[in-house]
């Protein structure tokens, strides 16, 4: 079965839109896939505004994502949370599901402005064509981790207190996997 969604305004998905064959989304505003799944045989998403894939999945045999006046942003969502330990406080980053736009065969992404993949995945089993009027950016996101401990040791009537705190930050990068030719311009 085919699915054809047309709207003069914005379209937001946070569930599952699954087509056995063709899946077409045409929006006069922004298309947002937040924590959702958009999948089918041939998937074509066109928006006048931005196309935002936020910790969601867009996948199909052939996938085409187009923003005629905006950007295509594929990003893994994060949230920093303050945690309190035995010794002070720090920040932990809660990571959402890894965002991904994937095609078994050909992946086409076309944006009037930028193509941005932030801590996310772009996959093409065959060729990938990334065309941006602005920049193409594959960037990392920060994942922070805080830990703290306090240890008490008693010996010969004395108490020794050891305190340890650690705040680490690592970069979680974006990936671009292409089985065939890559065109980026």
Where in this protein do the model-derived segments appear?
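Binding/recognition "hotspot" determinant
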Residues: 1-185
């Amino acid at each position: 079965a085919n699915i054809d969604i047309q709207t003069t305004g914005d379209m937001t998905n946070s569930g599952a839109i699954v087509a056995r064959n063709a899946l077409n989304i045409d929006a006069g505003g922004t298309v947002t896939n937040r924590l959702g799944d958009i999948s089918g045989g041939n998937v074509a998403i066109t928006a006048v505004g931005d196309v935002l894939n936020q910790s969601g999945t867009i996948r199909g045999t052939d996938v085409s994502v187009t923003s005629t006046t905006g950007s295509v942003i594929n990003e893994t969502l994060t949230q920093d949370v303050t945690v309190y330990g035995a010794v002070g406080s720090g920040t932990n980053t809660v990571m959402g599901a890894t965002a991904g736009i994937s095609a078994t065969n050909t992946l086409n992404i076309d944006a009037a402005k930028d193509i941005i993949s932030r801590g996310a995945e772009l996959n093409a089993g065959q060729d990938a064509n990334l065309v941006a009027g602005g920049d193409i950016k594959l960037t990392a996101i920060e994942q922070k981790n805080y830990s703290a401990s306090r240890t008490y040791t008693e010996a010969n009537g004395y108490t020794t207190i050891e305190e340890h705190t650690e705040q680490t930050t690592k970069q979680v990068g974006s990936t671009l996997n292409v089985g065939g030719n890559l065109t980026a311009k």
